[in-house]
Regions:
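Extracellular glycoside hydrolase catalytic/binding regions
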Residues: 183-296, 321
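A short beta-strand element within beta-rich, extracytoplasmic domains
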Residues: 509-520, 564
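Substrate-binding clefts and catalytic carboxylate motifs of secreted carbohydrate-active enzymes
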Residues: 46, 54, 58, 81, ...
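Short beta-strand-plus-loop segments that form exposed binding edges in beta-rich domains
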Residues: 565-572
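Disordered, acidic Ser/Thr/Pro-rich linker "stalks" and the adjacent N-terminal cap
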Residues: 450-506, 517-522, 542-546, 572, ...
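Secretory targeting and sorting signals
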Residues: 1-36
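Active-site mouth of glycoside hydrolases
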Residues: 46-48, 53-227, 404, 414, ...
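Extended extracellular/luminal ectodomain segments enriched in beta-structured repeat modules
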Residues: 497-498, 506-513, 558-560
Length: 584
């Protein structure tokens, strides 16, 4: 059996077109169609020579997964149609789906309508159902899904039904060993039960089930004979699907329900130890390559819905979306060309041919100047505008991109201020042409605390605190961690105000600089104090607008003891410091 792919996080926040159904949910069905108007869709032909037909006519799926709000369907359907797209795919179907089906039908587009089953394909995608014993959940889905099929089967926007998404893979996040095998058998058997129920209600549309790798297909072959065809999400390995199908002895055709450029889980790490994101040109080529491999398996691969017609301008959106914030990328035009759309009169995006970080991208000092060198050209000669953004995914799983104030130094050189929080950040350059097109490239930088001049008087000295965390998460987090010179260890306090940490310098000593390297649990308000006897304190610095990261400032102080005294936490947790440096 083909081994499962490297464990991956969800590519985007699950872009369900309709809400995920849960046990006990009460949902009102929209009014049924006034009359039967749906197409009859069939998988026809014989072994190795299949085709999909709609009302008796051959139909090759030229599709994209759907990302925008259903309310925007009429806005985006004409654009999809102009790309040569004839199909979109969703992950969920419920009462909210009707406007999408109606809009699709009105524009000559059909929908692969999904039904979501837990656990889905990645951590956080859904709960861990026991498909061997949880009859309540299974009965709920067996009741709910056919209701929506009955409601929408005559809608001309429906192409087929797709039961589940990546759950054969996703079950590995819930079970292991022999129990995992039993659960996978039980899940695929349940999918077959759903397929039979759907066929009983709607014999006019095929039923499939999507998973994340071809290693799921033996389970479907064994346990789900009532599926009309298979479906798989495959990115960098999409050109290997044909070989897996041929070696597996399968007797059903398949479709690719997600594909595109190499995903985060498939690429090597860069010099900073995070996934090396392909550039815009490589991503565009990934879609072209994927479509070539789909169409190359004639009579078996019946088409694809490539990933992703989405508009999010966040970490996952930059990796995969064809039009983040409605701006079209090279990938958008690659898909349009693949599907036969007319690009002869299109104004196309700027191309970023080079993007580098000046200096050492592995040691960028927090809060200091960061200079980027960008080389971009526009095929239409348009004037270009630049924007720089950053993202903290590899620090705290943040998805948002934050625009940074920049200074254009000329000659493609842009200066911004580096983030003030240590860790590996993604830095993006966005180049727009004023005609709705964008080029985006990204690099990683490892942000480190600035190196103060002088000697760290606190390094290795005795430290005490009002409290510390003896055991939570990665703790124990004792006071000594804050003065050990190691940015990977931390002191953490109780979850209350006030809290303090102090270091004993051994003798009355003059110091001129303090550096605090905060973990995510930072101080919003605090003071730095000094004392000769540990009893009587003098304040040398007051901060009321702390935002975490690295606080690096000059002071004028003398004393044996130096204390940071937190009075207002920035989070619901305690105070946590990687390092407390006192410099003379």
């Amino acid at each position: 059996m083909t081994p499962p792919p490297r464990t991956r996080a969800r590519r985007l926040a699950a872009p369900l077109t309709a809400g995920v159904l849960t046990v006990g949910a009460l949902t009102a069905l929209p009014a049924p169609q006034a009359h039967a108007a749906g197409s009859v869709v069939k998988v026809t032909g014989a072994q190795g020579d299949w085709q999909l037909t709609v009302d008796g006519k051959p139909y090759q799926i030229k599709g994209l997964t759907w990302g925008p709000s259903i309310a925007d369907a009429d806005r985006y359907m004409p654009d999809l149609k102009s790309m040569g797209v004839n199909t979109i795919r969703t992950w969920g179907t419920d009462a909210s789906s009707k406007p999408l089906f109606d809009s699709a039908a009105a524009h000559g587009v059909k929908v692969i309508a999904g039904f979501w089953l837990q656990p889905g394909g990645g951590p956080g995608s859904g709960g861990c159902v026991n498909y061997r014993t949880d009859t309540a959940y299974k009965n709920q889905m067996l009741d709910e899904f056919p209701k929506w099929v009955q409601t929408y089967k005559d809608n001309p926007g429906v192409l087929m039904w797709d039961v589940g998404n990546e759950s054969v893979l996703g079950l590995q996040n819930c079970y292991g060993g022999a129990e995992l095998e039993r659960q996978r058998d039980a899940y695929t058997s349940f999918v077959n039960d759903v397929a039979k129920r759907i066929h009983a209600v709607d014999p006019g549309h095929p039923v499939t089930s999507t998973d994340a790798w071809v290693g799921a297909w033996p389970y479907f072959k064994k346990n789900a004979p009532d599926l009309d065809l298979y479906a798989v999400n495959s990115y960098n390995a999409v050109c290997d699907v044909r070989s897996a199908w041929e070696k597996g002895g399968y007797t059903k055709p398949y479709i690719i329900t997600e594909t595109g450029p190499a995903g985060e889980w498939e690429v090597p790490d860069d010099a900073n130890g995070v996934p090396l994101e392909p550039g815009d040109r490589a991503k565009a080529d990934g879609y072209t390559r994927a479509w070539g491999c789909v169409t190359g398996h004639r009579g078996v691969a019946l088409g694809a819905t490539m990933f992703h017609y989405g508009t999010e301008y966040d970490f996952g959106g930059i990796w995969f979306n064809l039009l983040p914030a409605g701006q079209k990328r090279l990938s958008y035009y690659a898909v349009k060309r693949a599907y036969g759309g007319d690009t002869s009169h299109d104004n196309t995006p700027p191309a970023v041919s080079d993007f580098t970080v000046e200096g050492d991208a592995g040691r960028v000092q927090a809060g200091r100047d960061l200079t980027l060198a960008v080389r971009a050209t526009d095929p239409d000669g348009d004037a270009l505008s630049y924007e720089v953004l950053d993202n903290s995914m590899y620090i705290d799983k943040g998805k948002d991109l934050t625009p940074l104030p920049l200074t254009d130094l000329g000659g493609g050189r842009l200066r911004v201020t580096a983030p003030d929080r240590p860790g590996v950040w993604k830095v993006y350059v966005k180049v727009t042409d004023g005609h709705g097109n964008v080029g985006v490239e990204t690099r990683s930088v490892r942000v480190v605390p600035p190196t103060p001049s002088g000697t760290n008087l606190a390094l290795g000295r005795p430290a005490t605190a009002s409290s510390y965390q003896p055991g939570y998460g990665d703790c124990p987090c004792p006071t000594a961690n804050a003065v050990d010179g190691n940015q990977n260890t931390r002191w953490a306090s109780d979850w209350s105000d006030p809290q303090w940490l102090q270091v004993d310098l051994g003798a009355r000593t003059a110091f001129r600089h303090v550096q605090l390297v905060w973990e995510a649990s930072y101080a919003k308000a605090y003071t730095v104090r000094t004392s000769d006897d540990g009893q009587n304190w003098r304040t040398v610095r007051t901060v009321t607008d702390g935002n975490g990261g690295v606080d690096d400032f000059d002071v004028t102080g003398t004393g044996r003891y130096v204390r940071v005294n937190g009075t207002a936490r920035g989070t619901g947790y305690g105070y946590s410091l990687y390092e407390f440096g006192v410099y003379g």
